[in-house]
């Protein structure tokens, strides 16, 4: 019988532990970790994500600021908001909610964030730290997945890990983190041939393609570990993953649900990285 990898439970445990650490930092150093979230436009999904992050930050005792900006804001004005938070010593983490409107260059916005406060881990300087084996700020979804694998005693050394999706947010950093644990990694994408055959070789399969129930049990080797990063809506508005959960659970040894798997861990790692940034600020 398959084991459920419960990201919600682990995230709650981590947040309880983090709340104690935040209180200790406040008592000993007089520092409260500060997180600034910048939302441009009124995309419904982005609004939900931002509210969840704000709620979680307040729950663990952070200072939380959310800036909601018009979708018509110009790039220079957005950068000015970021620079204000770069200079604010009470803010230790800055997050610009993606996606941004088409007239704004994502790369320039990411470059505008102080790498020490880039809790999303997207700045090229943080990417370089990750690639060189000295990670500082790591994209939150891949780091959350690594925590899940550790918590559920998944030994990655020598295992074949297949990742579906090569984005800078999940796929590429995920590959590096797995390599650092001595896994053998295959990174697949929309041009990969014989994808089903490649997936059936995976000891660990990580799916991040944004297509609801794309992965069926035909893609899964008996006893594999399946991590579903997808968040999609079906025709009835129900939240579903990229993996057809019920049938894949028949063959997988361990599997994450959607919701309640990877999503809560992404927020947990965002909070942890903000706390670590605040902690580093005490050593200046």
Curated annotation (Swiss-Prot):
Q: Per the similarity annotation, which family is this? A: Belongs to the tetrahydrofolate dehydrogenase/cyclohydrolase family.
State how it assembles.
Homodimer.
State what protein this is by name.
Answer: Bifunctional protein FolD
Pathway where this protein functions: One-carbon metabolism; tetrahydrofolate interconversion
Membrane-spanning regions, if any? none
Checking InterPro entries in the record gives: Aminoacid_DH-like_N_sf, NAD(P)-bd_dom_sf, THF_DH/CycHdrlase, THF_DH/CycHdrlase_cat_dom, THF_DH/CycHdrlase_CS, THF_DH/CycHdrlase_NAD-bd_dom
Task: Report which reactions are catalysed by this protein.
Answer: (6R)-5,10-methylene-5,6,7,8-tetrahydrofolate + NADP(+) = (6R)-5,10-methenyltetrahydrofolate + NADPH; (6R)-5,10-methenyltetrahydrofolate + H2O = (6R)-10-formyltetrahydrofolate + H(+)
Determine the domain of life of the protein's source: Bacteria
Keywords for the protein's UniProt record, in alphabetical order = Amino-acid biosynthesis, Histidine biosynthesis, Hydrolase, Methionine biosynthesis, Multifunctional enzyme, NADP, One-carbon metabolism, Oxidoreductase, Purine biosynthesis
Q: Would you kindly state one Gene Ontology biological process term found in this protein's UniProt entry?
A: methionine biosynthetic process
The record lists NADP(+) as bound by 165-167, 190
| Enzyme Commission number(s) from the entry | 1.5.1.5, 3.5.4.9
Gene Ontology CC annotations of this record: cytosol
The organism named in the record is: Streptococcus pyogenes serotype M5 (strain Manfredo)
Molecular function (GO) terms for this protein are: methenyltetrahydrofolate cyclohydrolase activity; methylenetetrahydrofolate dehydrogenase (NADP+) activity
What the entry lists under CDD domains is as follows:
NAD_bind_m-THF_DH_Cyclohyd (cd01080)
Function (record text): Catalyzes the oxidation of 5,10-methylenetetrahydrofolate to 5,10-methenyltetrahydrofolate and then the hydrolysis of 5,10-methenyltetrahydrofolate to 10-formyltetrahydrofolate.
Signal sequence annotation: none
């Amino acid at each position: 019988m398959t084991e459920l990898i419960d990201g919600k439970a682990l995230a709650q445990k981590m947040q309880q532990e983090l709340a104690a650490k935040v209180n200790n930092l406040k008592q000993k150093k007089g520092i409260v970790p500060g997180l600034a979230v910048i939302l441009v436009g009124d995309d419904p999904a982005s609004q939900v994500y931002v509210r969840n992050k704000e709620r979680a930050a307040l729950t663990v005792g952070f200072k939380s600021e959310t800036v909601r900006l018009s979708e018509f804001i110009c790039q220079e004005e957005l950068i000015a908001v970021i620079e204000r938070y770069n200079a604010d010593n009470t803010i230790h983490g800055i997050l610009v909610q993606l996606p941004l409107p088409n007239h704004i260059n994502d790369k320039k916005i990411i470059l505008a964030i102080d790498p020490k406060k880039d809790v999303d881990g997207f700045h090229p300087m943080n990417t370089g730290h990750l690639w060189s084996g000295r990670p500082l700020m790591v994209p939150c979804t891949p780091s959350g997945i690594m925590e899940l694998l550790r918590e559920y005693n998944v030994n990655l050394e020598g295992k074949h890990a297949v990742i579906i999706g090569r984005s800078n947010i999940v796929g590429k950093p995920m590959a590096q983190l797995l390599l650092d644990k001595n896994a053998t990694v295959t990174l697949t994408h929309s041009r990969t041939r014989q994808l089903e055959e490649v997936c059936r070789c995976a000891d660990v399969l990580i799916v991040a393609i944004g297509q609801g129930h794309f992965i069926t049990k035909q893609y899964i080797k008996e006893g594999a570990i399946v991590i579903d990063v997808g968040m999609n809506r079906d025709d009835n508005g129900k939240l579903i993953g990229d993996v057809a959960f019920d049938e894949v659970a028949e063959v997988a040894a361990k599997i994450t649900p959607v919701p309640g798997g990877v999503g809560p861990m992404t927020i947990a790692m965002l909070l942890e990285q903000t706390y670590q940034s605040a902690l580093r600020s005490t050593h200046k």
